Every structure is written in structure tokens, then in C-alpha cells.
């Protein structure tokens, strides 16, 4: 894979090398801990009751949400992956961290929105569930909004971004599948995404470029998410 571009949006996550080293080590430590599947939820009234911070992974169908969860945790089969758009149809909860000990996180792998190889009524049902969860979950600390780096931000992504802005829910753009692009292409899509993201009030300023295949950007994302863990 081509080297990731050195841009302010990609490299300004930490104020100095010492802070970066501490944050990266905290991320490495947390994501090396036990991570286990908790439950799959098909409605808001079945969401688990807990006191941990939640991090949700959202994006279009087949954008690589489950692959990213697996890459973050270093477990190839934690979240079920598929080449079939729409395979994930529940809100899948995973608990990350030492048992009965802080820090810890609850990660939520959401169904994809947009095109899916599933009945239309099922797609509508889980799309409503996704939007209701994103708007009204008190435990939700951040949404990682995954964007396929080959395609950039699409209109249904913009719909989600506007909804999160209106609900004042913090979200961070994570570009996926960067291994599919050349360095110049990555630089171009990153610049366009950073410029558009800057117009959204709830968007985190750092856009992270990742590849679940090569591991690029995974350490940085681990570090930023570990900072949100319940103390």
C-alpha cells in the first residue's frame, strides 16, 4: 500500500511526540485486552443497560465496518464479515477491556445503510433502527462514520452527517480501504473529505485514513478511541 499522506488533518491528533507516544500506548493496551460479543439488538428496547462509553461504527453497506472492528481488536473473526451488502442486520455489541475493571469500551457494529441485498422492508426497518439509535443513545460518545476511500462522501453519508449535526452527536470520519488507492489518490480524497467535514459542527476535525488489510491508520484510531474509554 502507498504511504499515507502527511497532512494536518491526519497528523494533528497529538500536540507533541510524548503525548502521541502515551496515547498510542494506551490504545495498544486497551485494544489488546479481552473483547467479547455481548449481544445483537433488533430494537431500541433490547439495547443493553450498562455504564460504559459506546463507540458506534456506521457507514454504507459493505464499507468495511466489521473488518475495521476486527482490525482494531486484532481478531480476524470477532465481527462477522461478508462481501454481501446488508449481511449485518442487528446492532452488534462488543465489550472491550478487562473484565470488571476500567478502562473499558462498548463497541457497536451497526448495519449498513444504502444498498443491501436484502428485502426492502428489512432494509427500511434496520435503517430506522440505526437512525433512532444514533439520535437518542445517551451512552454514545462517538460515531466512527466510515467512508470508502475509493468513492468519498456520498449523499446518504451527508444525510447521516446532517442528522448527527442536528442531534449534536460527535462523529469522526474514517476512510477505509486505502490499500486500494495510489498515494496521489489518497491525498486527493483526503483533501476533499477534510474540506467537506470542516463545514459540519459535530464532526471531529481529524479524518483518519485506514486499511484493515495493511493495518495503516489502525494505531491512531485505537489511540483516539481509547481516550474515550470509561475511566
From Swiss-Prot:
The keyword Nucleotide-binding applies. Its cofactor is Mg(2+). Signal peptide: none annotated. Mg(2+) binds at residues 66, 88. GO terms for molecular function: GTP binding; metal ion binding. One of its GO terms (cellular component) is cytosol. GO terms for biological process: division septum assembly. Pfam families: MMR_HSR1 (PF01926). GTP binds at residues 59-66, 86-90, 109-112, 176-179, 210-212. Keywords: Cell cycle, Cell division, GTP-binding, Magnesium, Metal-binding, Nucleotide-binding, Septation. Residues 51-231 form the EngB-type G domain. The keyword Ribonucleoprotein does not apply. InterPro entries: G_ENGB_dom, GTP-bd, GTP-bd_ribosome_bio_YsxC, P-loop_NTPase. SUPFAM superfamilies: P-loop containing nucleoside triphosphate hydrolases. Belongs to the TRAFAC class TrmE-Era-EngA-EngB-Septin-like GTPase superfamily. EngB GTPase family. Necessary for normal cell division and for the maintenance of normal septation. This is Probable GTP-binding protein EngB. It comes from Rhodospirillum rubrum (strain ATCC 11170 / ATH 1.1.1 / DSM 467 / LMG 4362 / NCIMB 8255 / S1).
Amino acid at each position: 500500500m502507498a504511504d499515507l499522506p502527511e497532512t494536518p488533518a491526519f497528523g494533528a491528533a497529538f500536540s507533541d511526540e510524548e503525548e502521541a507516544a502515551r496515547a498510542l500506548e494506551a490504545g495498544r493496551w486497551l485494544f489488546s485486552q479481552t473483547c467479547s460479543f455481548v449481544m445483537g439488538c433488533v430494537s431500541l428496547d433490547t439495547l443493553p443497560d450498562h455504564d460504559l462509553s459506546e463507540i458506534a461504527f456506521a457507514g454504507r453497506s459493505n464499507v468495511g465496518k466489521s473488518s475495521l472492528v476486527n482490525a482494531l481488536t486484532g481478531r480476524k473473526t470477532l465481527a462477522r464479515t461478508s462481501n454481501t451488502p446488508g449481511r449485518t442486520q442487528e446492532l452488534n455489541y462488543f465489550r472491550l477491556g478487562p473484565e470488571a475493571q476500567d478502562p473499558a469500551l462498548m463497541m457497536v457494529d451497526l448495519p449498513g445503510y444504502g444498498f443491501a441485498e436484502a428485502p426492502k422492508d428489512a432494509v427500511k426497518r434496520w435503517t430506522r433502527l440505526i437512525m433512532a439509535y444514533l439520535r437518542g443513545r445517551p451512552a454514545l460518545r462517538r460515531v466512527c462514520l466510515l467512508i470508502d476511500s475509493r468513492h468519498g462522501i456520498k449523499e446518504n453519508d451527508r444525510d447521516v452527517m446532517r442528522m448527527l449535526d442536528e442531534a449534536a452527536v460527535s462523529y469522526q470520519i474514517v476512510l477505509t480501504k486505502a490499500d486500494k488507492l495510489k498515494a496521489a489518490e489518497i491525498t486527493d480524497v483526503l483533501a476533499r473529505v477534510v474540506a467537506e467535514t470542516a463545514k459540519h459542527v459535530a464532526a471531529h476535525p481529524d479524518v483518519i485514513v485506514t486499511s484493515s488489510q495493511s493495518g495503516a491508520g489502525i494505531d491512531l484510531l485505537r489511540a483516539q478511541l481509547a481516550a474515550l474509554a470509561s475511566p
